[in-house]
Amino acid sequence: MDELTSLESWIGPLLQRLEPAGRARLARRIAQDLQRAQSERIGQQRAPDGSQYARRKNQKRQKGGRIRRRKMFARLRQSKHLKARGNASEASVFFIRRAAAIARVHQEGLVDQVRRGGPRVRYERRELLGFADGDKQRVIDTLLNHLSGL
């Protein structure tokens, strides 16, 4: 979070010069760029620090079905579940409804039921949303593009 506070202290005075509608427009654009980057990173199965996600656990009876061979979180990264919002005071990227509950279990490595009435399992920690190395530069580039377009 130290990177975010340094970014905020640098950008804050520039944003104060904008009208609230202009800040909201900029925040929406930043949130959309971050949403796109988060979705791509989830598709690559990488955490914000660049490490690979922990693999799925092997089942006791190995089944060679399609689900086991596909990437994890394929539907979570869709814009239907991964939303971006921005207003005059903030830009945010988040999961909604049931997707938020699933993402939280994986993000924090919690215990959850595999299916209703099924066994409870501790999931490996897989950081889905986070501030990656390139995200700070992405925010700065979006800000500079917005300010140069005024």
Regions found by a protein language model. Name each.
Residues 1-150:
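Short, Lys/Arg-rich flexible segments
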